[in-house]
Amino acid sequence: EAQESERRQAEFAERTQLFMDTMNVDEMVAQLLVAEGFTNLEEVAYVDLDELTSIDGFDQSTAEELQARARESLEEINAKAIEHAKELGVEQSLFDFEGLTPQMIEALAEDGIKTLEDFATCADWELAGGYTTVDGKRVKDTGLLEKFDMSLEEAQTLVMNARLQLGWVKESDLAKEEEAAEAGDEDEEQA
């Protein structure tokens, strides 16, 4: 219980610092955002204004300014990520692929994934993270996109969409696999 409390306090402090650094707000404003459940710039930048104005002390003008700062900061971060990814040799096919942010593309490029073809060869757990057993012990594998809160399901969908886009699989193949999986589930239920 003490460890959990320490973890939450560290997370709170980390998020507070993130907002202070990226949005140029004072500690009190940053703490209010974190206390209200905001965890990243995207949430502040694109949340409905009513959610911000419902916070004690935040009027319409303050909420609009916070969103403007968050969006401006995101644009700067995205531009730097794109520039770095290009320096690393990322091909346009990966930039054009829907579902990956510039920061995700940068993280992939840092690991040598620079084309849509490279991305399509990834396993879901390589992106989202997971656990494997090594010498009888359960070991955590950190996913390349885990820091972006990527779930296994999201990773599966993105990889499958890349494979579809490249023509490696067809929609009809996926439909057949789904039907077979559903039939297998029904067989298990009847047993």
Predicted regions and their residues:
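C-terminal extensions
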Residues: 1-191
